[in-house]
Regions:
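Short runs within selected transmembrane alpha-helices of multi-pass transporters and secretion channels
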Residues: 31-34, 103-122, 128-140, 144, ...
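Short alpha-helical transmembrane segments in multi-pass integral membrane proteins
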Residues: 41-106, 148-200
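Helix-terminus/linker motif at the lipid-water interface of multi-pass membrane proteins
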Residues: 1-25, 43, 83-90, 151
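Small-residue-rich hydrophobic transmembrane alpha-helices
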Residues: 15-78, 111-124, 128-129
Length: 200
């Protein structure tokens, strides 16, 4: 994304770097959560306790959603206090603060999809997420952002020449990705339901 935004100039590049850095910092929480939950789910599965594995998988996604919404709220409510930590340039502060509106949505979805993808690996589901990533994040997110920024005539005037189209497209694509992974995980959990659940 940064390579496509660089052609817009220093203001866009600086604002995008602030937004991207905050998104990366926030991502550390769901990444850590996903690693921990997948390790525990795999342990339960390896021990033959499918019920506990299913319960923890569902709990992990709920924790990811709640923590993602909390951090998204912090970004939304505190953006005018957070961005000035990075820069004192008024123009960069204004544009980066506007981008954080979309970064908040981006992170909420990113948190859910991150934990889902780790949990799906516990059931050896890897190909379907790869297809979803390639089609939605690269096709819809990156290519869609490029189209909105440089080729779509109906792009809002205040988005032109800014990184906003890229963040809008990426955020929407990530929301769809998160929903797809939640649906896929629910399907996997139903397919591999514990024996006692199937009997009851």
């Amino acid at each position: 994304m940064a390579l496509f935004i660089a052609r817009q100039g220093a203001l866009s590049a600086a604002s995008h770097q602030i937004a991207a850095n905050l998104a990366a910092v926030c991502y550390m929480l769901p990444l850590s959560l996903g690693i921990a939950i997948s390790a525990r789910v795999s342990w339960w599965r390896g021990a033959g306790h499918e019920t506990q594995a299913h319960q923890l998988a569902r709990l992990g996604v709920r924790i990811a959603l709640v923590s993602g919404l909390v951090l998204a709220s912090v970004l939304l409510l505190g953006r005018w206090f957070i961005v000035p930590i990075y820069t004192s340039e008024p123009a960069v502060i204004a544009l980066a603060s506007a981008l954080l509106l979309w970064v908040a949505l981006y992170h909420a979805a990113d948190s859910v999809q991150c934990v889902c993808i780790f949990v799906l690996r516990c059931w050896r589901v890897t190909v379907a997420p790869l297809v979803v990533y390639c089609s939605l994040l690269w096709g819809g997110g990156l290519a869609g952002g490029y189209g909105l920024a440089y080729h779509y005539s109906a792009t809002p005037a205040d988005w032109v020449g800014t990184p906003t189209p890229f963040w809008v497209s990426s955020s929407v694509s990530l929301v769809v990705t998160a929903l797809a992974f939640v649906w896929l995980l629910r399907r996997v959990l139903r397919t591999h339901a514990p024996l006692e659940s199937k009997v009851s």
